[in-house]
Amino acid sequence: MSKKEAVAVWTPKEFKGNDLIPYEAAPVQVANIPLVGNDNIDANDMVVPALNLLHGTSKAVTDGVEDAAPGRFMHSGTEQVLPEGDVRLIVVHYHKSNALFPKEDDRYANLETCIAQDGIEGTVYGLCEECKKCTEWDNVNSKPPLGAEVHNFVCMTSLGPVILRMSRSTFKAGSKFLSTKASSGKNFFAHPTVVRVTQEPKTLPTGKVTNYYALQMAWQTTEDVPEGLQLAAYELYKSLAQKHETGNLKSNDDAAADAGFELD
Protein backbone atom coordinates (compact mmCIF):
# COMPACT_ATOMS: atom_id res chain seq x y z
CA MET A 1 0.00 0.00 0.00
CA SER A 2 1.42 3.40 -0.96
CA LYS A 3 1.80 6.24 1.52
CA LYS A 4 -1.05 8.14 -0.14
CA GLU A 5 -3.35 5.11 0.15
CA ALA A 6 -2.36 4.64 3.77
CA VAL A 7 -3.19 8.18 4.92
CA ALA A 8 -5.80 9.45 2.48
CA VAL A 9 -9.50 9.18 3.19
CA TRP A 10 -10.13 10.57 -0.27
CA THR A 11 -8.84 9.10 -3.50
CA PRO A 12 -9.93 11.29 -6.42
CA LYS A 13 -9.50 10.27 -10.01
CA GLU A 14 -5.86 9.76 -10.97
CA PHE A 15 -4.24 12.94 -12.24
CA LYS A 16 -1.53 12.96 -14.90
CA GLY A 17 0.55 15.91 -13.81
CA ASN A 18 1.73 17.51 -10.58
CA ASP A 19 -0.85 16.50 -7.99
CA LEU A 20 -0.42 19.03 -5.17
CA ILE A 21 -3.63 18.22 -3.31
CA PRO A 22 -2.73 18.13 0.42
CA TYR A 23 -4.14 14.73 1.26
CA GLU A 24 -2.79 15.24 4.77
CA ALA A 25 -4.37 18.49 5.94
CA ALA A 26 -1.80 18.98 8.73
CA PRO A 27 2.01 18.88 8.52
CA VAL A 28 3.53 15.55 9.50
CA GLN A 29 5.60 15.81 12.69
CA VAL A 30 8.13 13.28 13.91
CA ALA A 31 6.60 11.26 16.75
CA ASN A 32 7.17 12.67 20.26
CA ILE A 33 8.87 15.85 18.97
CA PRO A 34 6.74 18.99 19.33
CA LEU A 35 6.82 21.85 16.83
CA VAL A 36 9.26 24.48 18.11
CA GLY A 37 10.94 27.64 16.86
CA ASN A 38 7.86 29.71 16.04
CA ASP A 39 7.76 31.64 19.32
CA ASN A 40 9.46 34.77 18.01
CA ILE A 41 8.04 34.75 14.50
CA ASP A 42 5.67 37.69 14.02
CA ALA A 43 2.61 36.70 11.99
CA ASN A 44 2.99 39.95 10.04
CA ASP A 45 6.45 38.83 8.91
CA MET A 46 5.10 35.68 7.30
CA VAL A 47 4.72 35.73 3.53
CA VAL A 48 3.04 33.40 1.07
CA PRO A 49 5.34 32.02 -1.65
CA ALA A 50 4.23 32.16 -5.27
CA LEU A 51 3.88 29.32 -7.73
CA ASN A 52 5.32 31.01 -10.81
CA LEU A 53 5.06 29.87 -14.41
CA LEU A 54 8.53 30.19 -15.90
CA HIS A 55 9.22 31.89 -19.23
CA GLY A 56 12.37 32.18 -21.32
CA THR A 57 13.07 35.57 -19.75
CA SER A 58 12.45 34.46 -16.15
CA LYS A 59 15.44 35.05 -13.89
CA ALA A 60 15.50 31.41 -12.76
CA VAL A 61 15.83 30.33 -16.40
CA THR A 62 18.47 32.89 -17.40
CA ASP A 63 20.43 32.21 -14.18
CA GLY A 64 20.47 28.49 -14.90
CA VAL A 65 18.60 27.34 -11.78
CA GLU A 66 18.50 23.54 -11.78
CA ASP A 67 15.58 22.16 -13.85
CA ALA A 68 14.26 25.68 -14.56
CA ALA A 69 12.76 25.79 -18.06
CA PRO A 70 10.00 27.72 -19.84
CA GLY A 71 6.55 26.25 -19.23
CA ARG A 72 7.37 24.75 -15.83
CA PHE A 73 6.29 25.94 -12.39
CA MET A 74 8.71 27.10 -9.69
CA HIS A 75 8.01 27.59 -5.98
CA SER A 76 9.41 31.04 -5.18
CA GLY A 77 10.21 30.16 -1.57
CA THR A 78 12.21 26.97 -2.05
CA GLU A 79 13.07 27.47 -5.76
CA GLN A 80 11.78 23.94 -6.31
CA VAL A 81 10.95 23.46 -9.99
CA LEU A 82 8.06 21.09 -10.63
CA PRO A 83 8.20 18.47 -13.37
CA GLU A 84 6.74 19.51 -16.70
CA GLY A 85 2.96 19.25 -16.72
CA ASP A 86 -0.27 20.63 -15.33
CA VAL A 87 -0.96 21.16 -11.62
CA ARG A 88 -3.87 20.13 -9.40
CA LEU A 89 -4.49 22.00 -6.14
CA ILE A 90 -7.23 23.55 -4.00
CA VAL A 91 -8.02 27.27 -4.31
CA VAL A 92 -8.88 28.84 -0.95
CA HIS A 93 -8.78 32.66 -1.23
CA TYR A 94 -8.99 35.22 -4.02
CA HIS A 95 -8.10 38.90 -4.27
CA LYS A 96 -7.29 41.32 -7.06
CA SER A 97 -4.22 43.56 -7.13
CA ASN A 98 -2.43 45.94 -9.47
CA ALA A 99 1.28 46.03 -10.31
CA LEU A 100 3.55 48.29 -12.34
CA PHE A 101 7.10 47.25 -13.21
CA PRO A 102 9.10 49.73 -15.35
CA LYS A 103 10.52 48.32 -18.58
CA GLU A 104 13.18 49.45 -21.04
CA ASP A 105 10.71 51.53 -22.98
CA ASP A 106 10.27 55.30 -23.32
CA ARG A 107 6.75 54.97 -21.92
CA TYR A 108 8.24 53.99 -18.57
CA ALA A 109 10.71 56.89 -18.30
CA ASN A 110 10.98 58.12 -14.68
CA LEU A 111 8.41 55.59 -13.44
CA GLU A 112 8.95 53.46 -10.34
CA THR A 113 7.78 50.00 -9.34
CA CYS A 114 4.36 50.29 -7.71
CA ILE A 115 2.30 47.46 -6.23
CA ALA A 116 -1.24 47.73 -4.90
CA GLN A 117 -1.82 44.54 -2.92
CA ASP A 118 -5.48 45.37 -2.40
CA GLY A 119 -6.06 46.84 -5.85
CA ILE A 120 -6.99 50.11 -4.15
CA GLU A 121 -3.81 51.96 -3.19
CA GLY A 122 -0.30 51.48 -4.59
CA THR A 123 3.03 51.76 -2.82
CA VAL A 124 4.17 54.73 -4.92
CA TYR A 125 1.39 56.34 -6.94
CA GLY A 126 -1.44 56.28 -4.42
CA LEU A 127 -5.06 55.50 -5.19
CA CYS A 128 -5.45 53.20 -8.20
CA GLU A 129 -8.76 54.82 -9.13
CA GLU A 130 -6.94 58.12 -9.66
CA CYS A 131 -3.67 56.72 -11.05
CA LYS A 132 -5.10 54.28 -13.65
CA LYS A 133 -1.62 53.26 -14.86
CA CYS A 134 -2.62 49.60 -14.54
CA THR A 135 -6.06 49.88 -16.10
CA GLU A 136 -6.12 52.66 -18.70
CA TRP A 137 -5.19 52.00 -22.33
CA ASP A 138 -3.37 54.53 -24.51
CA ASN A 139 -6.05 54.59 -27.19
CA VAL A 140 -4.23 57.19 -29.28
CA ASN A 141 -1.22 54.92 -29.79
CA SER A 142 -3.07 51.61 -29.26
CA LYS A 143 -0.84 50.73 -26.31
CA PRO A 144 -1.86 48.56 -23.33
CA PRO A 145 -1.77 49.89 -19.75
CA LEU A 146 1.67 50.49 -18.26
CA GLY A 147 0.90 48.12 -15.42
CA ALA A 148 -1.43 45.18 -15.04
CA GLU A 149 -4.47 44.05 -13.13
CA VAL A 150 -3.74 40.75 -11.43
CA HIS A 151 -5.92 37.87 -10.26
CA ASN A 152 -4.37 36.33 -7.12
CA PHE A 153 -5.48 32.85 -6.10
CA VAL A 154 -4.10 31.59 -2.78
CA CYS A 155 -4.09 27.81 -2.90
CA MET A 156 -3.73 25.01 -0.36
CA THR A 157 -1.15 22.51 -1.57
CA SER A 158 1.09 19.74 -0.31
CA LEU A 159 3.88 22.36 -0.45
CA GLY A 160 1.93 24.67 1.85
CA PRO A 161 -0.06 27.77 0.84
CA VAL A 162 1.01 29.37 -2.45
CA ILE A 163 -0.16 32.30 -4.56
CA LEU A 164 -0.99 31.69 -8.20
CA ARG A 165 -1.20 34.85 -10.30
CA MET A 166 -2.93 35.51 -13.60
CA SER A 167 -2.42 38.79 -15.45
CA ARG A 168 -2.31 40.33 -18.90
CA SER A 169 -2.85 37.53 -21.45
CA THR A 170 -4.15 35.11 -18.81
CA PHE A 171 -6.32 37.67 -17.00
CA LYS A 172 -9.42 36.70 -19.02
CA ALA A 173 -8.84 33.03 -18.21
CA GLY A 174 -8.79 33.95 -14.53
CA SER A 175 -12.00 35.95 -14.95
CA LYS A 176 -13.68 32.97 -16.62
CA PHE A 177 -12.73 30.74 -13.69
CA LEU A 178 -14.12 33.33 -11.25
CA SER A 179 -17.40 33.46 -13.18
CA THR A 180 -17.74 29.68 -12.94
CA LYS A 181 -17.18 29.80 -9.19
CA ALA A 182 -19.52 32.76 -8.60
CA SER A 183 -22.41 31.16 -10.48
CA SER A 184 -22.01 27.82 -8.68
CA GLY A 185 -22.99 29.00 -5.21
CA LYS A 186 -20.09 26.96 -3.79
CA ASN A 187 -16.77 27.72 -2.11
CA PHE A 188 -13.56 27.57 -4.15
CA PHE A 189 -12.48 24.59 -2.07
CA ALA A 190 -15.59 22.51 -2.80
CA HIS A 191 -13.71 20.98 -5.74
CA PRO A 192 -10.04 20.66 -6.79
CA THR A 193 -8.73 23.06 -9.42
CA VAL A 194 -6.56 22.02 -12.35
CA VAL A 195 -4.12 24.61 -13.71
CA ARG A 196 -3.19 23.85 -17.30
CA VAL A 197 -0.19 25.22 -19.18
CA THR A 198 -0.79 26.10 -22.82
CA GLN A 199 1.67 27.21 -25.46
CA GLU A 200 0.47 29.93 -27.80
CA PRO A 201 2.02 32.08 -30.55
CA LYS A 202 2.77 35.74 -29.88
CA THR A 203 3.83 38.45 -32.34
CA LEU A 204 6.57 40.69 -30.98
CA PRO A 205 6.82 44.44 -31.81
CA THR A 206 9.58 43.52 -34.28
CA GLY A 207 7.13 41.36 -36.18
CA LYS A 208 8.81 38.14 -35.11
CA VAL A 209 6.44 35.38 -34.00
CA THR A 210 7.43 33.47 -30.89
CA ASN A 211 5.75 31.06 -28.49
CA TYR A 212 4.77 31.91 -24.96
CA TYR A 213 3.21 29.95 -22.13
CA ALA A 214 -0.17 30.81 -20.63
CA LEU A 215 -2.43 29.41 -17.93
CA GLN A 216 -5.95 28.03 -17.91
CA MET A 217 -7.88 27.10 -14.75
CA ALA A 218 -10.57 24.43 -14.59
CA TRP A 219 -12.70 23.36 -11.65
CA GLN A 220 -12.91 19.58 -11.30
CA THR A 221 -16.61 19.56 -10.45
CA THR A 222 -16.75 15.78 -10.80
CA GLU A 223 -14.60 15.54 -7.65
CA ASP A 224 -15.93 16.68 -4.26
CA VAL A 225 -13.36 17.66 -1.64
CA PRO A 226 -14.24 15.75 1.57
CA GLU A 227 -15.59 17.63 4.58
CA GLY A 228 -12.42 17.32 6.68
CA LEU A 229 -10.25 18.88 4.00
CA GLN A 230 -12.85 21.58 3.34
CA LEU A 231 -12.79 22.47 7.04
CA ALA A 232 -8.99 22.78 6.91
CA ALA A 233 -9.34 24.98 3.82
CA TYR A 234 -11.91 27.15 5.58
CA GLU A 235 -9.58 27.68 8.56
CA LEU A 236 -6.84 28.74 6.15
CA TYR A 237 -9.30 31.03 4.37
CA LYS A 238 -10.17 32.83 7.62
CA SER A 239 -6.49 33.43 8.35
CA LEU A 240 -5.83 34.71 4.83
CA ALA A 241 -8.92 36.93 4.81
CA GLN A 242 -7.81 38.56 8.06
CA LYS A 243 -4.33 39.16 6.68
CA HIS A 244 -5.76 40.66 3.49
CA GLU A 245 -8.09 42.94 5.43
CA THR A 246 -5.18 44.32 7.47
CA GLY A 247 -2.85 44.61 4.47
CA ASN A 248 -0.58 41.79 5.62
CA LEU A 249 -1.25 39.23 2.89
CA LYS A 250 2.10 39.39 1.14
CA SER A 251 4.20 37.19 -1.11
CA ASN A 252 7.97 36.81 -0.98
CA ASP A 253 8.31 37.93 -4.61
CA ASP A 254 6.10 41.03 -4.46
CA ALA A 255 9.00 43.40 -5.04
CA ALA A 256 10.53 41.41 -7.88
CA ALA A 257 10.02 42.30 -11.52
CA ASP A 258 10.15 38.56 -12.18
CA ALA A 259 7.08 37.92 -10.05
CA GLY A 260 5.03 36.82 -13.00
CA PHE A 261 2.89 39.92 -13.43
CA GLU A 262 4.33 41.04 -16.74
CA LEU A 263 5.70 37.77 -18.06
CA ASP A 264 2.53 36.06 -19.21
Q: What positions do the PLM features span?
A:
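OB-fold ssDNA-binding interfaces and closely related basic DNA-contact patches used
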Residues: 1-159, 206-211, 220-227, 263-264
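Extended serine/threonine-enriched, polar tracts that run as long, contiguous segments within proteins
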Residues: 142-220
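Accessory, usually C-terminal, subdomains that scaffold auxiliary metal cofactors
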Residues: 185, 189, 194, 198-263
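Polar/charged alpha-helical tracts
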Residues: 49-52, 63, 129, 176, ...
